[in-house]
Amino acid sequence: MTIDRHLKHLAQKDPENRQKALLDVLIQEGLEFSLQEQEPSIQNPRGIRNYLLTPWSPEPSLLFCAHYDAVPGTFGANDNAAAVCILIQLAQTLKKEHIPARFAFFDGEEAGNMGSKFYVSSLDRTSLTG
């Protein structure tokens, strides 16, 4: 799939459809991932679902991230499906070239960076070089 086709697929008004579209794209592109989930809360009634690509190298690496949620009621093409598409392409390229990297796609950015805060709370910083 190309970036423009990914973008059309990811630009969804409904948050559940957007999340499913991201899942579809990661599977179609053969990128292994894990799901980091946080239960729903008063601040974020949907809970958090971060998608973390499985590192292809045990070496310390750079971390690339983007949020996949969008302002409620919008398609989120600029904010932030475009960045997600670019990072998926970058992940494929770096993996093919055996360049160590980590990728995270965060939920809950529009609700106060909830997904990235949740991710950082359990991050092993020794696995990163920057």
Where are these regions (language model features)?
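Active-site beta-strand-loop-beta-strand hairpin of nuclease catalytic cores
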Residues: 58-63
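Histidine-centered divalent metal-coordination motifs
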Residues: 67
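Acidic/histidine-rich catalytic neighborhood of metal-dependent amide-processing enzymes
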Residues: 71-130
